[in-house]
Swiss-Prot record:
It comes from Pyrobaculum islandicum (strain DSM 4184 / JCM 9189 / GEO3). Catalyzes the isomerization between 2-isopropylmalate and 3-isopropylmalate, via the formation of 2-isopropylmaleate. This is 3-isopropylmalate dehydratase large subunit. Gene3D superfamilies: Aconitase, domain 3. [4Fe-4S] cluster binds at residues 295, 353, 356. One of its GO terms (molecular function) is metal ion binding.
Length: 414
């Protein structure tokens, strides 16, 4: 029987490809944002008439430098808006709409889809079982123009999630655990297929975090095999019905088992995503700023757990909290999470990448220590090259903001 990767491409191609095959594929969705869109559209212009193969399959979002913090960023947005209007693209999200990957996940991605976008964290949509893969501007421009592009079929790698999360452990810790085990390039050339033993013990928000950070693992894609959680999510969020196919497990080049109950809160210490340590190993490190958000951990459950901790008092470190989309912002507002965070002293704004890439809304200064729920912590990632970034789950981040230092979040959840 086919693996999930083989099943998807079998349906697309009419035959079962082998790992390493170079194939042309018609994508179900193509996306770009403000930081990559300028280059995508420049390439399209160089190809002659600016046109897209199917405007219903194109998603555009302003997220990286939104709202524009510089004159150049504003000029780029004007340029992209002009083309969006001329092309009559209906799925355009201007300032405040949210981060491209979250928008694709919550509004468009479906199991079995093939999704290409001009950003490395396109993998996020694998949370619902889509083959989602980041590409460069030239390849995305070709996909937009021609309605197809090439892809190298990756080798399938199986990961089994056994058991349930203990308190204070989240999808971020699973991602960091995998990075510790396999390294930052451990899944190069692989499509990681994740099977969950107890589906409802591994919610969609946590799946999205793991899929998102598969980029840091080097994976071509990471897909959670659709199950009852996938079906419920699509029905609840979009009113869309989906029935997973009845597939027997295929053949994998390798496999790995994650025992969820044995995990504890983890961090990736400076300056590498695979420099992973238990929170208890770095307890007491003083923190200047905390960032809760990004396409990795800016979802509703992330804000819920942060609010549970931050209702205890005022923050001792600067805390910037940014929901990943307008939809999440509105829900967090209605549920009172944003009220709790602002009363605790956090700065909260709408969906934008913000400080994740060191662009704006909280760039780190020289010597500053940041605890961030985002996905990268290399030198200078969030600002000054002399700053230090610890990647953590939202509970650990919120507890660090509350105490002004890295602490184990579990006592704050009792």
């Amino acid at each position: 029987m086919p693996t999930w990767t083989e099943y998807i491409f079998q349906k697309k191609l009419g035959h079962t490809p082998s790992p390493g095959d170079v194939v042309e594929v018609v994508p179900d969705l193509v996306g770009f944002h403000d930081l990559t869109g300028y280059h995508v559209l420049e390439v399209l212009e160089s190809m002659g008439k600016v046109e897209v193969f199917d405007k219903e399959r194109v998603v555009v979002a302003f997220d990286h430098l939104s709202p524009p913090p510089t004159q150049r960023a504003a000029e780029i947005m004007v340029y992209i808006r002009k083309h969006v209007k001329a092309l009559e693209l209906p799925h355009f999200y201007d300032v405040g709409g949210g981060i491209l990957h979250q928008i694709i996940l919550e509004k468009y991605a479906m199991p079995e889809y093939v999704i290409f976008a001009a950003d490395s964290h396109t993998n996020t949509a694998g949370a619902v079982g889509a083959f989602a893969h980041g590409m460069g501007a030239t390849d995305i421009a070709a996909a937009l123009k021609l309605g197809k592009t090439w892809v190298v079929i990756p080798a399938p790698f199986r990961v089994d999630m056994k058991g349930e999360f203990p308190p204070g452990v989240m999808g971020k810790d699973v991602a960091l655990h995998l990075l510790k085990q396999f390294g930052a390039e451990g899944f190069n050339g692989y499509s990681v297929e994740v099977f969950v033993e107890i589906p409802k013990a591994f919610p969609m928000d946590d799946r999205a975090t793991v899929a998102n950070m598969s980029t840091e693992m080097g994976a071509d894609a990471l897909m959670f095999i659709p199950d009852v959680v996938t079906v419920d999510y699509l029905q609840r969020e979009r009113g869309v019905s989906y029935k997973p196919p009845d597939l027997q497990p295929g053949r994998y080049v390798d496999k790995y088992v994650v025992e969820l109950s044995k995990l504890e809160p983890l961090v990736a210490a400076p300056y590498s995503v695979d420099n992973v340590k238990a929170v208890r190993e770095v307890e007491g490190v003083e923190v200047d700023q905390v960032f809760i958000g990004s396409c990795t951990n800016g979802r509703l459950s992330d804000f819920e757990i942060a609010a549970r901790i931050l209702r205890r008092g005022r923050v001792k470190s600067r805390c910037i909290a940014i929901p990943a989309s307008y939809t999440i912002f509105r829900k967090a507002l209605e549920l009172g999470y944003i009220d709790i965070l602002t009363k605790a002293g956090c700065v909260v704004t709408y969906g934008t990448c913000g400080p994740c890439l060191g662009g704006h809304f909280g760039v780190a200064g020289p010597g500053e220590v940041v605890v961030s729920t985002s996905n990268r912590n290399f030198k200078g990632r969030m600002g000054h090259p002399d700053s230090k970034v610890y990647l953590a789950n939202p509970a650990t981040a919120a507890a660090a903001a509350l105490e002004g230092k890295i602490v184990d979040p579990r006592p704050y959840l009792l």
